[in-house]
Amino acid sequence: MERIKELRNLMSQSRTREILTRTTVDHMAIIKKYTSGRQEKNPSLRMKWMMAMKYPITADKKITEMIPERNEQGQTLWSKVNDAGSDRVMISPLAVTWWNRNGPVANTIHYPKIYKTYFEKVERLKHGTFGPVHFRNQVKIRRRVDINPGHADLSAKEAQDVIMEVVFPNEVGARILTSESQLTITKEKKEELQNCKISPLMVAYMLERELVRKTRFLPVAGGTSSVYIEVLHLTQGTCWEQMYTPGGEVRNDDVDQSLIIAARNIVRRAAVSADPLASLLEMCHSTQIGGTRMVDILRQNPTEEQAVGICKAAMGLRISSSFSFGGFTFKRTSGSSVKREEEVLTGNLQALKLTVHEGYEEFTMVGKRATAILKKATRRLIQLIVSGRDEQSIVEAIVVAMVFSQEDCMVKAVRGDLNFVNRANQRLNPMHQLLRHFQKDAKVLFLNWGIEHIDNVMGMIGILPDMTPSTEMSMRGVRVSKMGVDEYSNAERVVVSIDRFLRVRDQRGNVLLSPEEVSETQGTEKLTITYSSSLMWEINGPESVLINTYQWIIRNWETVKIQWSQNPTMLYNKMEFEPFQSLVPKAIRGQYSGFVRTLFQQMRDVLGTFDTTQIIKLLPFAAAPPKQSRMQFSSLTVNVRGSGMRILVRGNSPVFNYNKTTKRLTILGKDAGTLTEDPDEGTAGVESAVLRGFLILGKEDRRYGPALSINELSNLAKGEKANVLIGQGDVVLVMKRKRDSSILTDSQTATKRIRMAIN
């Protein structure tokens, strides 16, 4: 206080003021400090000092031709004195005002296009709704979040090439635009930015915002999609939160959300097929999300959800080195362990073979609604510090950690038999058996765990087996904390391997992901997901399977027909018939298959019994492993619309109806397409017309390769011979004529010769 009084006293004397404002600074150290290097040492002071001068700005000489010397008020706008050390002129801040009011107006058409991300942000905020502010403790955890709404998902390198191509098309340098998205964006932007006068550097900077995902490691308590992160400073503080609903969605959030749904559906479906890995790859390659190929999105999108991780691993991409258990992401932060097999007995005396991790390790566990720090030794939980949004979330985390610890008291808490199976009806591995058991009911586990007296530690509280908080007692080793545990910040990606059953392992053989870890949560995708793979026909229910199966046969009828007559086994094993089997009652599948296969064989053997409609109708039933029996069927049952419906072996039914006159097929009353070939016409019509220009030589001759369809005959060279499949399922040998003169007579001869060749 004394010092301040003294200073005030000094400043009131005019001499003091004069010394401070007038004397030159001549101390070398001070001069050095403020003049060495190009870096401004005190920017704010410099700015204030410059703006106090009359002409603080320098500009190119030609500005004097564009701006008057004085404004309307008669104030000078620029000095006739040149800037020291350059040939620029000194200008008053008033000149800027004059320019803004009276200067030339450029074409503004490009502004919304260049500053698209800003314009869109304003719209989102305008239409967003801010709710009440609540004061409460915020459990924030640092997560890697997307801070840039509305971006495409190009890698930095890809974006750089696009930007160079759009902004500096004539610059030298190799630019390879390969991906679909790169080419589309480049074309779009070049058109948008024709005759754009905005500085190229600004355009490049704004394009980068639009093309590349920018992530930061930020403390978040609520939503993590980019439209929430852009208002993070408005929605959560240290002790308050404000409710907010965004005024619009952005494609990048929609892509992330839809990708997770597609990946989950695909992994769930692949897990129950005969070859999970092959099926998964087939589905990833044939699926589109919002019109973009799923594999392209997987290559660029950094989302770290379990199902997405499995799909990436299958494609040979690197994924995060953390592993998943019970829906929590575990990251080992210290310690190490070795694995060994050990047999343990449950409380029900059931033997389980556990892979035990020996050694001291520490982990962070991060889930959707709870996080924890776990310290464990061999089959022993030393400490677990949990924080979560609500009691339920905390329970989930504790159960997962207790099972993960592999403690004996946990194994002994099992009541009843463990026989959980996955979607493919295979038994789960022991760790997941235990997990499922206690996720259903953790009462016994918590009661058997044991309790201990606790010390009073700031920010931590005990928790009892019935989940009531306590300051005196707690379950052994378990504490609840007010603070969240940060997600693992390091975004390192590691090379992984994946086995046939979709278990993903790191190079040390630790399982990081498996189908058991994929969430069962169902959601509605924001973008349209188009699954072209037959494996996904089931996703829209039994009717869709039925219609899709028959449509597939009709679309591919030409090749199906040849396989039907030449290589039926290969045809029956086609994966396109796999979904259909789920519609056929399990007990009778084999008999149906045996019956249909025998029927087909008779059609192949007995002339004139080939019937297109009937083959199409019955073909899917022949795909199941056949049981030999003498049973005959007049109708076959399929389970659709919640009950068994009948398909008549001969004739139409509501399930399968073929109209001979219109040649239209309707399945369950829905149009399923046209059959190209009418089964009941004699050979003469279609074949003789098509076989003009060919000579029929006789019966099939295997030396000339597999039978061609009539459409494929056009590829033959003159004089070349081939087997050809004709309407009634018969195969004959033909030769393409060397001359065209006798084509007219061919159609009559063809009819006769076909009959002879066959008989």
UniProtKB/Swiss-Prot annotation:
Which family does the similarity line name? Answer: Belongs to the influenza viruses PB2 family.
Could you tell me which species this protein originates from? Answer: Influenza A virus (strain A/USA:Texas/UR06-0195/2007 H1N1)
Q: What is this protein called?
A: Polymerase basic protein 2
Main localisation: virion
Question: Where is the protein localized?
Answer: Virion; Host nucleus; Host mitochondrion
One cellular component GO annotation, for this chain's record?
host cell mitochondrion
Which Pfam family, an example, fits this chain?
Flu_PB2_5th
- Subunit structure, as described in the record: Influenza RNA polymerase is composed of three subunits: PB1, PB2 and PA. Interacts (via N-terminus) with PB1 (via C-terminus). Interacts with nucleoprotein NP (via N-terminus). Interacts (via N-terminus) with host MAVS (via N-terminus); this interaction inhibits host innate immune response.
- S-adenosyl-L-methionine: is it a keyword of this entry? no
